[in-house]
Amino acid sequence: MRHRCRVPQLGKPADQRKALLRALTTELIRHGQIKTTKARAKAVRSEVDRMITLAKDGSLAARRRALGYMYDKPTVHALFADAPSRYKDRDGGYTRIIRTLRRRGDNAEMAVIELV
C-alpha cells in the first residue's frame, strides 16, 4: 500500500511531470536561477540537490547518472567541474526559494529558485 507516500502531482501525468522536473533542473543548473511557480520550485529543489550531490561525488557512475537525468551534456560537465569546489562545505540546501509577486493571468504564487 502507498499510504503517505506523496509526491507533488503538479497537475500532470507522471511522464509529463518527470519531463518537467528534468527540464527545470537542467535550466536551473544552466542559468543559476529561474522564475517558476512556488509548487514547481519546491518540487524541483530535491532534484537539484540530488544532482549537486552526485557532482560532489564526482565518480564516473555519478556522472553517468546525471547525464541520464539532465537534458544537456555540457551543463552536466560544467556542474561536475564547478560543484565540488563551490559546495565543499555544504551538506545539502544548495538552493534558495524567494517568493515574488503573483502571476497576473491566474494569480498563481510565483517564486524565484536560485543556487546558493
Swiss-Prot record:
GO BP: translation
GO cellular component, one term: cytosolic large ribosomal subunit
SUPFAM superfamilies: Prokaryotic ribosomal protein L17 (SSF64263)
Domain of life: Bacteria
Classification via Gene3D superfamilies: Ribosomal protein L17
Annotated GO MF terms: structural constituent of ribosome
InterPro entries: Ribosomal_bL17, Ribosomal_bL17_CS, Ribosomal_bL17_sf
Keywords attached to this entry: Ribonucleoprotein, Ribosomal protein
Self-association and partners: Part of the 50S ribosomal subunit. Contacts protein L32.
Family membership: Belongs to the bacterial ribosomal protein bL17 family.
PANTHER family, per the entry: LARGE RIBOSOMAL SUBUNIT PROTEIN BL17M, RIBOSOMAL PROTEIN L17
Protein name, per record: Large ribosomal subunit protein bL17
Biological source species: Synechocystis sp. (strain ATCC 27184 / PCC 6803 / Kazusa)
Lineage: Bacteria, Bacillati, Cyanobacteriota, Cyanophyceae, Synechococcales
